[in-house]
Amino acid sequence: MAPPPLITLEEHFFSTSVGSNPDTNKAYVEQFKHVPGLESKLKNLSDLRLRDMDAGKVSFQVISHGPTPGAPSPQQCIEANDELAAAVPNNKTRFAGFAVLPMAHPEESAQELERCVKQHGFVGALIDNHILGKYYDGPEYRTFWQKAQDLDVAIYIHPTWP
């Protein structure tokens, strides 16, 4: 009997759009200095990623942007999500997408989640567990949580830097 397929979640990529945020870029530049090959792997959404998946016997990845210290703008998130969305159709049997969202802007986060799910077929979003020390339990986030519920998609809450 063949082993079951290996499906991985929390498989990050790095978009230069979100990386243009100084706080995010600073954190990643430091990591890139100390982990050889990390930058090229995180920026690759095609052949290198597929080779690594094959080597690890990974059948399918749900890809999301890496943690985003600071607060990415709505436009940076749109651009990063569009970058990921361009890669997914080329490998539909291997990739799915989780959106990166501008959680400092709850209304825009709800809109971007809806756009990513309806236009790009994303299966949810990965969000940091707070944005600049602010958590998502206030009334201003009700619209966001309602949108996720209405769309029936997963919201993966990822630990991030303090």
Where are these regions (language model features)?
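Helix-coil boundary/capping segments in enzymes
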Residues: 1-162
